From Swiss-Prot:
Binds 3 Mg(2+) or Mn(2+) ions per subunit. Its EC number is 4.2.3.16, 4.2.3.121, 4.2.3.122, 4.2.3.20. The keyword Membrane does not apply. It comes from Cannabis sativa (Hemp). This is (-)-limonene synthase TPS1, chloroplastic.
Length: 623
């Protein structure tokens, strides 16, 4: 057996469960930083292979050559009956990489310069805000971040220093508020008091006649923080206005207007909760190219950027597809969801920019690992086996493998090798050995999975509070964000590391709660069929006697409250964490809601999930 490049560490001590779940989940009645030069971003040139030190080899797993040898006492085990993947190896490898090459790059660069001149050259204040909004919704704002921040900073400064600022109407006020909040400028919610009836304290009734103003206020309200009552009132008020407008529009039997499409889209999910790529595709195809004042340069740039990024994703997916086939994990662990493409789809939501290819590839492998751990606990492992697996991980000792069944040996080897691969990369880029941090989180993850397994086998029905306190840690958000921290942070600080390892800061907690609850909303019906520990919806029903519909509404409310808490954290200037890491945290919440918006988008392979993969990864937008 070849030796791994890292020494084994001492056993982890028992892990405290950090939690401060408040009564929303009960029924309603710096130390010295480790500074290294900023690492170069991994580019597409090292997708196919990455050289490693000759002393670093993965541990080889030779215990499983025949898939059938992994299965023992099969009659005692549950089965989810997951179907085979609809995206085969041959299909992925046959994808044509259409939008690559110097001619496309040259054209994109030319268009980018034109759009930059356009953005800087706009003199009218409202027109400039509208252009920024359009650029964002077209999915190309990441190319103009410096220019956008400079423009918004100037507007923010002028507003603060000018005793007589521009007297905007509701539409313009809401648009500026949303854009400034989005980029971290502290704009007070009280600016919307100008649109309230001073006698009643309520928003003026005639706002319902200004549908673009109401829509703008609705979108702005989702940038509210915990305790901002004006924005909460705005959300409730404008939701009623937009639903009324939607009802009136649907009764006209005419073709949907662009405003109607925007209203329906917003009511389905606000912009703040949407991932950039899916919003860009929808806005390009459904709205922008149908607008009478559409700018051809902007449209061509947005389409070309989308398609060139998609070609990058296809290259990455081919690399991952070869890795998955060579690993034989699908054959050795036949009970596990074989959903490589869906695991990759998460990454398009988390970090879509072209320079983050290596992160998307490694994070996809991490999602594969989390899927294996999840299915092993939820579906296949016996309680005794799961305890043995957690013990083996905690000791991090290959000698423990003799106690495990063959299928768990495979899972352990994959966990062991992947963790050490990540640690090797972190050592190269940061000069820091992080394996103890990552290992501790993996052990913690399995302990919380094990708790759910104990509930299932004992028939125990947890309260909603018990479930969420355990579930936001069993869903794996803390593991995902630990990986992201090292990918997007330089220098690494001990304060942040200790916070991530032991304290589970709010920046991790709230994103993980959204992931947990969105998962529950999307997967409940499938999990009821196969039998599983009660999820948040069932826990609330059991706690309160509520119907399933009422319980779902309560879980949606908890998601909304978690977003407010996340918005609070985004404005925390004393945070240990970089803006890049904060963006990943936000995008994890957004990706969660995309994947589970119409059901179990991670496993079910229904038509809506298939269309999402086709639209974001497979099929280019016609030029």
């Amino acid at each position: 057996m070849q030796c791994i490049a890292f020494h084994q560490f001492a056993s982890s001590s028992s892990l405290p469960i950090w939690s401060s779940i408040d009564n929303r989940f009960t029924p309603k009645t710096s130390i010295t930083s480790i500074s290294k030069p900023k690492p170069k971003l991994k580019s597409k040139s090292n997708l196919k292979s990455r050289s490693r030190s000759s002393t670093c080899y993965p541990i080889q797993c030779t215990v499983v050559d025949n898939p059938s040898s992994t299965i023992t006492n099969n009659s005692d085990r549950r089965s989810a009956n997951y179907g085979p993947p609809i995206w085969s190896f041959d299909f992925v490898q046959s994808l044509p990489i259409q939008y690559k090459g110097e001619s496309y790059t040259s054209r994109l660069n030319k268009l980018e310069k034109d759009v930059k001149r356009m953005l800087i050259g706009v003199e009218n204040s409202l027109a400039q805000l509208e252009l920024i909004d359009t650029i964002q919704r077209l999915g190309i704002s990441y190319r103009f971040e410096n220019e956008i921040i400079s423009i918004l900073k100037e507007k923010f400064t002028n507003n603060n220093n000018n005793p007589n600022p521009i007297n905007y109407d509701l539409y313009a006020t809401a648009l500026q508020f949303r854009l400034l909040r989005q980029y971290g400028f502290e704009v007070p919610q009280e600016i919307f008091n100008n649109f309230k009836n001073h006698k009643t304290g309520e928003f003026k009734a005639n706002i319902s006649n200004d549908i673009m103003g109401a829509l703008g206020l609705y979108e702005a309200s989702f940038h509210g923080k915990k305790g901002e009552s004006i924005l909460e009132e705005a959300r409730i008020f404008t939701t009623k206005c937009l639903k009324k407008y939607k009802l009136m529009s649907s009764s006209n039997n005419n073709n949907m207007t662009l405003i109607s499409l925007l209203v329906n889209h917003a009511l389905e999910m606000p912009l703040q909760w949407r991932i950039t790529r899916s919003e860009a595709k929808w806005f390009i195809e459904e709205i922008y190219e149908r607008k009478q004042d559409m700018n051809p340069t902007l449209l061509e740039f947005a389409k070309l950027d989308f398609n060139m990024l998609q070609s990058t994703y296809q290259e990455e997916l081919k690399v991952l597809s070869r890795w998955w086939k060579d690993s034989k994990l699908g054959e050795k662990l036949p009970f596990v969801r074989d959903r490589l493409v869906e695991c990759f789809l998460w990454q398009v939501g988390v970090r879509f920019e072209p320079q983050f290819s290596y992160f998307r590839i490694m994070d996809t492998k991490l999602y594969v690992l989390l899927t294996i751990i999840d299915d092993m606990h939820d579906i296949y492992g016996t309680l005794e086996e799961l305890q043995l697996f957690t013990n083996a991980l905690q000791r991090w000792d290959l000698k423990e493998l003799d106690k495990l069944p063959d299928y768990m040996k495979t899972a352990f080897y994959f966990t062991y090798n992947f963790t050490n691969e990540l640690a090797f990369d972190v050592l190269q880029e940061h000069g820091f050995v992080h394996i103890e941090y990552f290992k501790k989180l993996m052990v913690e993850l399995c302990k919380h999975h094990l708790q759910e397994a104990k509930w299932f086998y004992s028939g125990y029905k947890p309260t909603l509070q018990e479930y969420v306190e355990n579930g936001w840690l069993s869903v794996g958000g803390q593991v995902i964000l630990m990986h992201a921290y090292f990918a997007f942070t330089n220098p690494v600080t001990k304060e942040a590391l200790e916070c991530l390892k032991d304290g589970h800061p709010n920046i991790v907690r709230h994103a993980s709660i959204i992931l947990r609850l969105a998962d529950d909303l999307g997967t409940l019906s499938d999990e009821l069929k196969r039998g599983d520990v009660p999820k948040s919806i069932q826990c609330y029903m059991h706690d309160t006697g509520a119907s399933e519909d009422e319980a779902r509404e309560h879980i949606k409310y908890l998601i909304s409250e978690s977003w407010k808490e996340m918005n609070n954290e985004d404005g925390n200037i004393n945070s240990f964490f970089s803006n890049e890491f904060v963006q990943v945290k936000q995008n994890l919440g957004r990706a969660s809601q995309m994947i589970y918006q119409y059901g179990d988008g991670h496993a079910s392979q229904n038509n809506l999930s298939k269309e999402r993969v086709l639209g974001l990864i497979i099929t280019p937008i016609p030029m």
